Regions:
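Conserved active-site tyrosine of GNAT-family acetyltransferases
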Residues: 19-23, 93, 121
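Short glycine-/small-residue motifs
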Residues: 123-126
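Residues within well-ordered beta-strands of beta-sheet-rich folds
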Residues: 10-12
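Vicinal oxygen chelate
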Residues: 1-8, 28-83, 87-117, 130-143
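Amphipathic alpha-helical segments
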Residues: 14-29
Length: 143
């Protein structure tokens, strides 16, 4: 049986120094495993890494052809503890240069949500879900 867990997510970066700086501006600290060609950030339960997109394609043995401005059909989420945090986080994202795609609003399913894109158009949701359950480390364990 395959373990039911996601432990590491890698974003293929077009401009690693610029993207690294954006995530540092979020206040996220890099791990000791980061290098000039790789950035790793510990989050609550998942490691987020940044790796040059051409190198990522090479590592996966695929041909790199993606337009940097195209939608990548994947999104990441930052789940929060309170609905008001969605608004304050989006304001912080706006201040550091993130592109707000959807302003904070109440969701039809009872939560609060907003979307932004980082400098390379990776899609992020900032969300409060009233059903979310977090462990003592802040990792979401259920919703």
């Amino acid at each position: 049986m395959i373990p039911q867990r996601v432990s590491l997510i890698t974003i293929g970066a077009y401009d690693l120094p610029m993207l690294r700086a954006f995530y540092q501006k979020l206040g996220w600290e890099e791990t000791a495993h980061s290098s000039d060609n790789y950035a790793a950030f510990t989050t609550a339960g998942v490691i987020l890494t940044l790796f040059p997109i051409e190198e990522l394609a090479k590592d996966a043995e695929i041909t790199f052809t993606q337009d940097r401005n195209s939608y990548r059909a994947v999104s990441f989420a930052i789940n929060l503890d309170e609905p008001s945090q969605v608004d304050s986080v989006i304001e912080q994202i706006r201040e550091i240069g993130g592109t707000i795609l959807r302003e904070p609003s109440d969701a039809f399913w009872g939560g609060r949500t907003a979307y932004f894109a980082d400098p390379e158009n990776n899609l992020w949701e900032v969300v409060w879900n009233p059903s979310a359950v977090f462990d003592e480390r802040g990792a979401m364990i259920s919703y």
